[in-house]
C-alpha cells in the first residue's frame, strides 16, 4: 500500500488531517512505520525544502538525497532515530533526533558531523566461522572478528559510534554514572542530561531497569533502560538540539 489516510497515519507526522485525505505510507525498511518519517514528507513538511510531494519525488529520484551516506531514490523510504540526511547540492545536513512534542525531528548538523552516527546494539548472534554479528537498531549488521574479545563482552543497548557509509566502529559508549544520555522513547522522549543512577530489580530483566536522568536545569526524569541512549561520556558526541 503506497498511501494511508491521514487519520490512520502515525500521530507524530506533521500532516494536516484537514488539508488532504491521504498521506504517504513509509516503505518497509530499517525503521518501523510508527517510528519513522517518509523521506518525501521530511523534505516537504519538516524542512519546507520542497513545496509539493511531486517536487520531493523529483529531487529524491534524481539521487540528490543521501541517508546515512547512501543515495535513496524512494520517496517513501523511512528515516528514523539518529539517521543522517544529506543534501550536498544545498549544503544541508541533518540528523533525526527525539522530540518532546512530536517524537522525531530533524536538527541541522555540520558536514563533518554527517560522516558518522550513533546507533544502539540491540542483540548479538554467533554466525558461521565463530564470528559475532552485532544487530543494530537501524537494521544494519556488523561482523566482529574472534580477536575482538572486548567487543564480544559488550552488553545490549550499548551505543556504537560508526562511520557512514563504511560502518567502521569509532567509539563505544556504555551505561555508567554521569555519561550523557537521551530518552528516545516513552513519555520523556527528548529529555537530555546526565545519567545519575540505574535502579535495578531482581524480578525484571536488565532492559527494564529504571534510568534516572538529570537535565541541565537540575530536574530529574525516569525512564526504562530500553528507552535511553548513551550519547557521550564527557559531552554529547553529536548535536541533538
Swiss-Prot record:
<dbReference type="Pfam" id="PF00900">
    <property type="entry name" value="Ribosomal_S4e"/>
</dbReference>
<dbReference type="InterPro" id="IPR041982">
    <property type="entry name" value="Ribosomal_eS4_KOW"/>
</dbReference>
<dbReference type="Pfam" id="PF08071">
    <property type="entry name" value="RS4NT"/>
</dbReference>
<protein>
    <recommendedName>
        <fullName>Small ribosomal subunit protein eS4</fullName>
    </recommendedName>
</protein>
<keyword id="KW-0687">Ribonucleoprotein</keyword>
<dbReference type="InterPro" id="IPR000876">
    <property type="entry name" value="Ribosomal_eS4"/>
</dbReference>
<dbReference type="GO" id="GO:0003735">
    <property type="term" value="F:structural constituent of ribosome"/>
</dbReference>
<comment type="similarity">
    <text>Belongs to the eukaryotic ribosomal protein eS4 family.</text>
</comment>
<dbReference type="GO" id="GO:0006412">
    <property type="term" value="P:translation"/>
</dbReference>
<dbReference type="InterPro" id="IPR013845">
    <property type="entry name" value="Ribosomal_eS4_central_region"/>
</dbReference>
<dbReference type="InterPro" id="IPR038237">
    <property type="entry name" value="Ribosomal_eS4_central_sf"/>
</dbReference>
<dbReference type="GO" id="GO:0019843">
    <property type="term" value="F:rRNA binding"/>
</dbReference>
<dbReference type="GO" id="GO:0022627">
    <property type="term" value="C:cytosolic small ribosomal subunit"/>
</dbReference>
<dbReference type="InterPro" id="IPR014722">
    <property type="entry name" value="Rib_uL2_dom2"/>
</dbReference>
<dbReference type="InterPro" id="IPR002942">
    <property type="entry name" value="S4_RNA-bd"/>
</dbReference>
<keyword id="KW-0689">Ribosomal protein</keyword>
<dbReference type="InterPro" id="IPR013843">
    <property type="entry name" value="Ribosomal_eS4_N"/>
</dbReference>
<dbReference type="Pfam" id="PF01479">
    <property type="entry name" value="S4"/>
</dbReference>
<keyword id="KW-0699">rRNA-binding</keyword>
<feature type="domain" description="S4 RNA-binding">
    <location>
        <begin position="37"/>
        <end position="99"/>
    </location>
</feature>
<keyword id="KW-0694">RNA-binding</keyword>
<dbReference type="InterPro" id="IPR036986">
    <property type="entry name" value="S4_RNA-bd_sf"/>
</dbReference>
Amino acid at each position: 500500500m503506497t498511501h494511508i489516510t491521514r487519520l490512520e497515519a502515525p500521530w507524530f507526522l506533521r500532516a494536516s488531517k484537514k488539508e488532504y485525505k491521504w498521506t504517504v505510507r513509509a516503505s518497509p525498511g530499517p525503521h518501523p512505520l510508527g517510528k519513522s518519517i517518509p523521506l518525501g514528507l521530511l523534505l516537504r513538511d519538516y524542512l519546507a525544502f520542497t513545496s509539493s510531494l511531486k517536487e520531493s519525488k523529483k529531487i529524491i529520484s534524481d539521487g540528490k538525497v543521501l541517508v546515512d551516506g547512501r543515495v535513496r531514490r524512494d520517496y517513501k523510504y523511512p528515516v528514523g532515530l539518529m539517521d543522517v540526511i544529506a543534501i550536498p547540492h544545498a549544503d544541508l545536513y541533518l540528523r533525526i533526533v527525539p522530540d518532546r512534542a512530536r517524537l522525531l525531528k530533524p536538527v541541522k548538523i555540520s558536514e563533518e558531523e554527517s560522516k558518522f552516527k550513533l546507533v544502539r546494539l540491540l542483540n548479538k548472534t554467533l554466525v558461521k566461522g565463530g564470528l559475532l554479528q552485532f544487530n543494530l537498531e537501524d537494521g544494519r549488521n556488523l561482523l566482529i572478528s574472534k580477536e575482538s574479545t572486548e567487543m564480544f563482552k559488550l552488553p545490549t543497548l550499548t551505543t556504537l559510534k560508526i562511520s557512514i557509509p563504511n560502518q567502521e566502529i569509532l567509539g563505544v559508549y556504555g551505561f555508567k554514572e554521569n555519561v550523557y544520555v537521551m530518552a528516545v522513547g516513552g513519555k520523556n522522549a527528548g529529555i537530555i542530561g546526565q545519567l545519575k543512577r540505574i535502579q535495578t530489580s531482581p524480578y525484571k530483566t536488565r532492559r527494564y531497569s529504571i534510568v534516572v536522568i538529570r537535565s541541565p536545569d537540575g530536574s530529574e526524569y525516569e525512564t526504562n533502560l530500553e528507552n535511553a541512549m548513551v550519547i557521550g561520556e564527557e559531552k554529547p558526541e553529536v548535536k541533538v538540539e
